Amino acid sequence: MDRKAFNDAVNALRPAGRRVARGTTVTSGWMGNRLQDLSMWLVNLLRELPPRVGRLVLALWRGARGLVLALPQAWRAATDRSGPGLAAWLRRVPREVGIWLIVLLFRVLDLFGVPELWSFFLQMVCHVTPLTGEEIGTAAEILGPTAIRYADVRIAEGGALNFVFARNGGRAFTTFHTINLPRTGPHCRANFAILLHELVHVYQYERTGGLYVAEAIYAQNTTGYSYGGPENLQQCLATGVCYRNFNREQQAQLVQDYYERCVEEHPVAAFEPFIWDMQAGKF
């Protein structure tokens, strides 16, 4: 092969070489990010261990206490003629036991770091990015600068989530520290009010553990998102209702509505006492 032919061959291979180099860089960067995410599993497991152990012990204590008190309560229900009776008490027992088992399950899952492992798995099958500086700054103005570990929050889009959003109507949802958003539609990342709503769920997770997932799903299927608007907030304040008395979805919706009213320069006085409770972490 003469020199000219050799140079032509090299020049022809250069674009392919650049593509391989770019692909290697992207792959190594992706692997580096995933290894960093995996290392955070152990960090968060150790950091969250004391409160998670405390929540598990509390759940076990409540279960033991309920078991000890079951017989006296059954006797009282059977002998108190002014009450609903033993049959009503027996009908109530399966529901209370079921709730306790769900609480216990989530406390055990928390203890072993399952929320972090779930988030790591999700990040393997979706496009994941951290919050931007602008998103953190705006969220901090509403939630508070130290409300949550903003650096740990990830936004997941695309990938396997496309299958989920095709079936749930494109509704955003939050799994622990990962906020799952569709790329298009009213719940996409560009809608900061929705992102803020989901950040409240992250806040709930950090304060109360993974149980917030079950509580939010229950809220969606029972009392829903509506807290009654500003008029009801004034009445709630007068009767001693606090932020923690709202369900998990109402808590997030209240913060979302407060932000939107601030942006639109509408009155927010009725919201402020509840926002102060939220900023203080009173979930």
Language-model segments: residues:
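Metalloprotease/metallohydrolase-associated module, dominated by Zn2+-dependent proteases
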Residues: 41, 52-55, 62-65, 70, ...
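Generic structural signal for small/hydrophobic residues in well-ordered secondary structure
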Residues: 139, 177, 195-197, 201, ...
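Short, solvent-exposed loop/turn segments at secondary-structure junctions
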Residues: 156-162, 179, 185-187, 200, ...
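Catalytic Zn2+-binding segment of zinc metalloproteases
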Residues: 199-217
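Hydrophobic or amphipathic, alpha-helical segments that drive membrane association/targeting
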Residues: 2-164, 185
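Short pre-active-site segment immediately N-terminal to the catalytic Zn-binding motif
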Residues: 164-196, 240-244
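Conserved beta-strand->loop/alpha-helix structural units within folded catalytic cores of enzymes
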Residues: 192-205, 258, 263
